[in-house]
Design a protein with these regions (language model features):
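Solvent-exposed soluble domains appended to multi-pass membrane proteins
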Residues: 1, 5-8, 12-207
């Protein structure tokens, strides 16, 4: 069987934020999956920055506790040596292994790091025909990841695939001024107008 793993950039469930109320559920598909399949909480080693270290722990099973303060293994040890990972293990049993990410390949030295962890291919934004960006203009929208993921399956019709997908559409900064006209999702429980605008932007990007 094919295996898909999706890392949702800067994701959190708004229902878990005690002070925040949203007019309707911005992530109904997530909640449906959570209700009907195995689910749980994930402890991550970073907050506010450092997505690559969450990736590293998830892909390798190694804890960031054993690395230096502020270290990014993608930019240090993986420039010197290979590292076993989910990708290398699955390759041993015949899987083709891929990464799809709609941001730059050299950010966090990902191009090198994924190669060192045993991935066969890495499709970064440089290899995509990106035409749509988030409302703040900073990041490609995530919908392109669907077609790019399907391409990884189509490229290896006689193999099972492991495709690791990294989104970017919910990445900060979150604008303090309103940038979405007539947002589908609106928030309450936030008194500061700038923070309210930021939360409104965030929950709309989650969807």
């Amino acid at each position: 069987p094919n295996i898909i793993c999706v890392l949702l950039e800067s994701f959190c469930d708004p229902d878990e934020i005690n002070f925040l109320q949203v007019n309707e559920d911005p992530i109904p598909t997530f909640h449906e999956l959570e209700k009907n399949y195995s689910s749980g909480y994930l402890n991550i080693p970073v907050v506010g920055a450092g997505t690559a270290n969450t990736e590293f722990e998830m892909l390798t099973g190694l804890s960031m506790q054993y690395f230096g303060t502020g270290e990014y293994p993608y930019k240090t040890i993986l420039k010197q040596t290979d590292c076993e990972s989910i990708a290398s293990d699955l390759s041993k049993i015949g899987y083709a292994t891929h990464v799809v990410h709609n941001n730059g390949g050299n950010f966090y030295s990902r191009t090198n790091a994924f190669s060192k962890m045993g991935f066969d291919t890495f499709t970064s934004k440089e290899l995509m025909n990106i035409t749509e960006y988030t409302p703040n203009g900073s990041w490609p929208t995530d919908d392109i990841l669907v077609s790019e993921t399907m391409k990884t399956f189509d490229a290896t019709p006689n193999q099972s695939d492991f495709t690791y997908i990294i989104t970017v559409g919910t990445h900060g900064d979150y604008p303090k001024e309103p940038v979405i006209e007539n947002p589908t999702y609106t928030v309450s429980g936030v008194e500061d107008e700038g923070m309210k605008n930021a939360w409104t932007y965030y929950v709309n990007q989650l969807n």
